[in-house]
């Protein structure tokens, strides 16, 4: 039995979000051996237990208070929320933050030779999906009547098998759709991974641990989105150079040995530094321009 004094986090055992969830926890300094095929893994350096489960089980585990936190795709979370509301339940949870991975879109797709002019083209159509409530929510708003064909996998083969006229499924590149004679016609939901917390009172020690974890996650995400920039620049062009780096804090200016009119600049930029920007920096007299990744960051 799990020790209820330890923080319990549910994450996908395998699949699209599993590797990135593991990487996030590792970069937050949580030491967990996730190589073995265990349903429960224990952190070595923090009172944290990881439950490795199917992704569609995670929202329910959080909403039912079985675990304290869950890392889950917003599409799966929203489908579970709509399902429970349809059953007359009042599910409760908190979204702590959206994460910077797991991006996908839930889309409608029809056969390549179909005439699609908008959602109304699907009036009275039979649509195969693993997300019946998200599909219904979207088409109800469009005033479209339809019949749902619930499939838990291989949704894209439904039209060829004669099970459906169209599908509603997750799309990344669209290659799978094309291979099955389908084309994406409408995006109905865009999703990323998110971190959610159960409703209800949380023991103080657990809440403090959650706060520490959130600070680390924020630092990891900021580090991914930021770059450390070092360059040499003419003293009289500093303001122009800083203006080219939106999102950058005021730079650290250091004297450059043997050069009275040039300085070394160090700064953190939260913006991607494109080649065009570097060329503009060089045109302003900057040299020795280095753009480095940041592993950890805390403000």
From Swiss-Prot:
GO terms for biological process: L-histidine biosynthetic process. The keyword DNA-binding does not apply. Pathway: Amino-acid biosynthesis; L-histidine biosynthesis; L-histidine from 5-phospho-alpha-D-ribose 1-diphosphate: step 1/9. GO terms for cellular component: cytoplasm. InterPro entries: ATP-PRT_HisG_long, ATP_PRibTrfase_cat, ATP_PRibTrfase_CS, ATP_PRibTrfase_HisG, HisG_C, N-reg_PII-like_a/b, N-reg_PII/ATP_PRibTrfase_C. Its main location: cytoplasm. One of its GO terms (molecular function) is magnesium ion binding. It is an enzyme of class 2 (transferase). PROSITE patterns: ATP_P_PHORIBOSYLTR. Its EC number is 2.4.2.17. The keyword Glycosyltransferase applies. It catalyses: 1-(5-phospho-beta-D-ribosyl)-ATP + diphosphate = 5-phospho-alpha-D-ribose 1-diphosphate + ATP. CDD domains: PBP2_HisGL2. It is found in: Cytoplasm. SUPFAM superfamilies: GlnB-like, Periplasmic binding protein-like II. Its cofactor is Mg(2+). It comes from the Bacteria. Equilibrium between an active dimeric form, an inactive hexameric form and higher aggregates. Interconversion between the various forms is largely reversible and is influenced by the natural substrates and inhibitors of the enzyme. Catalyzes the condensation of ATP and 5-phosphoribose 1-diphosphate to form N'-(5'-phosphoribosyl)-ATP (PR-ATP). Has a crucial role in the pathway because the rate of histidine biosynthesis seems to be controlled primarily by regulation of HisG enzymatic activity. PANTHER family: ATP PHOSPHORIBOSYLTRANSFERASE, ATP PHOSPHORIBOSYLTRANSFERASE ATP-PRTASE. Belongs to the ATP phosphoribosyltransferase family. Long subfamily. This is ATP phosphoribosyltransferase.
């Amino acid at each position: 039995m799990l020790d209820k004094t330890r923080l319990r986090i549910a994450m996908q055992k395998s699949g699209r979000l599993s590797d990135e969830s593991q990487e996030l926890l590792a970069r937050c300094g949580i030491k967990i051996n996730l190589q073995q095929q265990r349903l429960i893994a224990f952190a070595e350096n923090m009172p944290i237990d990881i439950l490795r489960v199917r992704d569609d089980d995670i929202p329910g585990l959080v909403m039912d208070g079985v675990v304290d936190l869950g890392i889950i795709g917003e599409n799966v979370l929203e489908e579970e929320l709509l399902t429970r509301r349809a059953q007359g339940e009042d599910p409760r949870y908190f979204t702590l933050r959206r994460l910077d991975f797991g991006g996908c879109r839930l889309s409608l797709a029809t056969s390549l030779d179909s005439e699609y002019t908008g959602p109304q083209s699907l009036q009275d159509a039979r649509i195969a999906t693993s997300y019946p409530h998200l599909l219904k929510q979207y088409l109800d708003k469009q005033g479209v009547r339809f019949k749902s064909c619930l499939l838990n996998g291989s949704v894209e083969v439904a039209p060829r098998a004669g099970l459906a006229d169209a599908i509603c499924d997750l799309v990344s590149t669209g290659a799978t759709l094309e291979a099955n004679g389908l084309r994406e016609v409408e995006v109905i939901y865009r999703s990323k991974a998110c971190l959610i917390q159960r409703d209800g009172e949380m023991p103080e020690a657990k809440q403090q641990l959650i706060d520490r974890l959130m600070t680390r996650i924020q630092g990891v995400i900021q580090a991914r989105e930021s770059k450390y920039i070092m360059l040499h620049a003419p003293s009289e062009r500093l303001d122009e150079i800083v203006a080219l780096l939106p999102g950058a804090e005021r730079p650290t200016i250091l004297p450059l040995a043997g050069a009275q009119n040039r300085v070394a600049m160090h700064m953190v930029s939260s913006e991607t530094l494109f080649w065009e920007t570097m060329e503009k920096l060089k045109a302003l007299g900057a040299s020795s321009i280095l753009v480095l990744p940041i592993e950890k960051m805390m403000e």
